[in-house]
């Protein structure tokens, strides 16, 4: 029986860097900011990913007392399996979403975890990720090669220049077998490992991840200027 593909969107962040003057606490979460096309960042993200035929269903993790997702155009989407409460950190949000899939996903089914604030990801690149990893035992992620010169510094004083020839910038989706990702996150939490993405948890287990080249346009909207760039890329995608 072929493996199914499930989508997890952790969307419980508050966006401190988007609203530094308010410490991100009293401003609208960045995933609900509007793009030039009239959609919120989250809705644009969902529009792209839920349009992919291979994706069977989706679990979204939102902040406790989040009343904004109820207004989403995708709140009643047929592929939306359930909504879970996000955790204090990303890994807990993803783990809560994985637990919601336990009664649905098989061990070797795929789970794609995608940042809610990466609205410019192309469906074609996600489909290529699925194709490249189809027969892999663990999984992998979209990424781009680092092209800038990278400096390591201490208190703004440069210590060294890092060889960039083998450096990649991790993006999302990050796609792993259901049972592997569930074990990886549980193990990382048990061991007290602070992870910032799913691949970090896989690395902690000592497992292999595959990098699949993506485009620079798959940006994460973190700062105000990123919103301008996201609108530019989305406009270019329509041409």
From Swiss-Prot:
Keyword terms of this UniProt record: Isoprene biosynthesis, Nucleotidyltransferase, Transferase
Reactions listed under catalytic activity: 2-C-methyl-D-erythritol 4-phosphate + CTP + H(+) = 4-CDP-2-C-methyl-D-erythritol + diphosphate
InterPro entries, alphabetized: IspD (IPR001228), IspD/TarI (IPR034683), IspD/TarI_cytidylyltransf_bact (IPR050088), ISPD_synthase_CS (IPR018294), Nucleotide-diphossugar_trans (IPR029044)
PROSITE patterns reported for this sequence: ISPD
Pathway stated in the Swiss-Prot or TrEMBL entry: Isoprenoid biosynthesis; isopentenyl diphosphate biosynthesis via DXP pathway; isopentenyl diphosphate from 1-deoxy-D-xylulose 5-phosphate: step 2/6
Coiled coil spans: none
Domain of life: Bacteria
Pfam family, one: IspD
GO terms classed as biological process: isopentenyl diphosphate biosynthetic process, methylerythritol 4-phosphate pathway
Chain's role: Catalyzes the formation of 4-diphosphocytidyl-2-C-methyl-D-erythritol from CTP and 2-C-methyl-D-erythritol 4-phosphate (MEP).
Family designation: Belongs to the IspD/TarI cytidylyltransferase family. IspD subfamily.
Protein name, as recorded: 2-C-methyl-D-erythritol 4-phosphate cytidylyltransferase
Organism for this UniProt entry: Ruthia magnifica subsp. Calyptogena magnifica
């Amino acid at each position: 029986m072929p493996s199914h593909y499930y989508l997890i969107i952790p969307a419980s962040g508050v966006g401190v860097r988007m609203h530094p003057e308010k410490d991100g606490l009293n401003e609208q979460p960045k995933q609900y900011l509007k793009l030039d096309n009239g959609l919120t960042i989250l809705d644009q993200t969902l529009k792209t990913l839920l349009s992919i035929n291979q994706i069977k269903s989706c679990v979204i993790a939102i902040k406790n007392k989040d009343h904004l997702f109820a207004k989403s155009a995708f709140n009643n989407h047929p592929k939306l399996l359930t909504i879970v409460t996000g955790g204090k950190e990303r890994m807990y949000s993803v783990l809560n979403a994985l637990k919601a899939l336990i009664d649905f996903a098989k061990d070797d089914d795929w789970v794609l975890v995608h940042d809610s604030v990466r609205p410019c990801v192309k469906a074609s690149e996600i489909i290529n990720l699925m194709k490249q990893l189809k027969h892999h035992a663990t999984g992998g992620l979209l990424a781009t090669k680092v092209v800038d010169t990278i400096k390591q510094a201490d208190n703004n004083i440069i210590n060294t220049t890092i060889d960039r020839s083998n450096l990649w910038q991790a993006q999302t989706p990050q796609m792993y077998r259901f049972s592997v990702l569930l074990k990886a996150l549980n193990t990382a939490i048990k061991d007290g490992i602070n992870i910032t993405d799913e691949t970090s948890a896989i690395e902690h287990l000592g497992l292999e991840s595959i990098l699949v080249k993506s485009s620079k346009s798959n940006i994460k909207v973190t700062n105000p200027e990123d919103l301008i760039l996201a609108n530019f890329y989305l406009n270019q995608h329509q041409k």
